[in-house]
């Protein structure tokens, strides 16, 4: 039994602890239980024995032949189990292998070890953004409030993106709080969109030498932000919430000078470099790992309805000032030179240049390339073969 004076001082100390610690649940904080826990001698029990390891055959079967079925909302809990599959599904390269359950098919891929390293990089993007934000604050204290509100105080990548887009797309009659709730709901209910956001961040960081950090892209690259706003608008469009989808399209056009119809389908690993005056029509389809420069139009040829816009394959590079018009196909790994007007199909891994665009090497025997232009960003190597014009 404690003396009265000691009990009084002990009680006051507990009161000060409660009042200075907002994380303590005051309703469940009982003095008798706290005191007894402090002065009672507990008997140590031996640690439980670990469970026996599973049989080797079961382990192999679990790792190589089965893909767990999980709900989208629980995907973060099983991230390690899913990482080897998601990257294959969302970030396709020519010359890589894609694993689909017990089935293997050739899609031309990179080595598996590099895939796993890249998976880890995708998963760590949000942590890296936060680290970079704190580093920038230390270097430039003037950005402290902006970075704290945009990045440091946000609990997740989804919340930070919803906050950034809602601030940039709001106006007097469309408050940011309303947009934040809308964007957050879409992002939290669609982990595929969040995965695409991460892959787009990696694409910009890898392919654009002007991008100095992930946080730089996340806050300041309007091509990246316009693409993520389109992903949200497209999800609303598929839910038949077309009024909201078109409203977002309008605000993106006004704020970023980028005009994507919400019906257009956009892949992952997308780079919109500079992005000003990019126009993509309603029935256009853009594949994975595509790089598009500014002042590019993927449009129709008139006022006809139906499927009327271009289909862009994986790994395509589209140079600045290009117009690709009509329901035509730009093959996988093709390159479209700057200033071209493309009105006909372009075969895979070829280069089309000019107005009207012509294939490098001619229609009958076009020259092909092995590298992926959408990743290498090589915009000028074709010029010496296409023309002998020299300044």
From Swiss-Prot:
Compositionally biased region (Pro residues): 45-56
Disulphide bonds in the chain: none
Start and end residues of each stretch annotated as Disordered: 40-82, 353-375
Induction (free text): By light, cadmium (Cd), and slightly by sulfur deficiency.
Location, primary (coarse class): mitochondrion
Tissue distribution of the protein: Ubiquitous with higher levels in leaves and siliques. Localized in vascular tissues, particularly in phloem.
Spans traversing the lipid bilayer: none
Pfam annotation, one family: Hexapep
BP GO annotations: cysteine biosynthetic process; cysteine biosynthetic process from serine
Annotated compartments: Mitochondrion
Keywords, sorted A to Z: Acyltransferase, Amino-acid biosynthesis, Mitochondrion, Transferase, Transit peptide
Pathway, per record: Amino-acid biosynthesis; L-cysteine biosynthesis; L-cysteine from L-serine: step 1/2
Top EC group: transferase
MF terms (GO), sorted A to Z: serine O-acetyltransferase activity; zinc ion binding
UniProt EC number: 2.3.1.30
Xref: SMART domains: SATase_N
PANTHER family: SERINE ACETYLTRANSFERASE
NCBIfam families assigned: cysE, EPS_EpsC
Family note: Belongs to the transferase hexapeptide repeat family.
Assembly and oligomerization: Homomultimer. Interacts with OASC. Component of the cysteine synthase complex (CSC) composed of two OAS-TL dimers and one SAT hexamer.
Protein name per UniProt: Serine acetyltransferase 3, mitochondrial
């Amino acid at each position: 039994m404690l003396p009265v004076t000691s009990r009084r001082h002990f009680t006051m100390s507990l009161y000060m602890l409660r009042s200075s610690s907002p994380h303590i649940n005051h309703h469940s904080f009982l003095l008798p239980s706290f005191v007894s826990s402090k002065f009672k001698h507990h008997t140590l029990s031996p640690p439980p024995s670990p469970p026996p390891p599973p049989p080797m055959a079961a382990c192999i079967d679990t790792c190589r032949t089965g893909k767990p079925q999980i709900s989208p909302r629980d995907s973060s809990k099983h991230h390690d189990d899913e990482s080897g599959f998601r990257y294959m599904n969302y970030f396709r390269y020519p010359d890589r292998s894609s694993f689909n359950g017990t089935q293997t098919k050739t899609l031309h891929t990179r080595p598996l070890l590099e895939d796993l390293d890249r998976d880890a990089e995708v998963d760590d993007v949000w942590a890296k953004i936060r680290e970079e934000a704190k580093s920038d604050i230390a270097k430039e204290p003037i950005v402290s409030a902006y970075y704290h509100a945009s990045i440091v105080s946000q609990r997740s990548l989804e919340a930070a993106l919803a906050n950034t887009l809602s601030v940039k797309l709001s106006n007097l009659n469309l408050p940011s709080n309303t947009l934040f709730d809308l964007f957050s709901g879409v992002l939290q209910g669609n982990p595929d969109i969040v995965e695409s956001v991460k892959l787009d961040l990696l694409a910009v960081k890898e392919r654009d030498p002007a991008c100095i950090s992930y946080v730089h892209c996340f806050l300041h690259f309007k091509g990246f932000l316009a693409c993520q706003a389109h992903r949200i608008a497209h999800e609303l469009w598929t839910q038949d919430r077309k009024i909201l989808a078109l409203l977002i399209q309008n605000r993106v056009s006004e704020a970023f000078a980028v005009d994507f119809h919400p019906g257009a389908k956009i892949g992952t690993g997308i780079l919109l470099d500079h992005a000003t005056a990019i126009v993509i029509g309603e029935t256009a389809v853009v594949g994975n790992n595509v790089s598009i420069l500014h002042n590019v139009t993927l449009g129709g040829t008139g006022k006809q309805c139906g499927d009327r816009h271009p289909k862009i394959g994986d790994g395509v590079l589209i140079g600045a000032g290009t117009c690709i018009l009509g329901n035509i196909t730009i093959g996988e790994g093709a390159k479209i030179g700057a200033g071209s007007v493309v009105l006909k199909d372009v075969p895979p891994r070829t280069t089309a240049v000019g107005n009207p665009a012509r294939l490098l090497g001619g229609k009958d025997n076009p020259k092909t390339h092995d590298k992926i232009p959408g990743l290498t960003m090589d915009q000028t190597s074709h010029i010496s073969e296409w023309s002998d014009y020299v300044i």
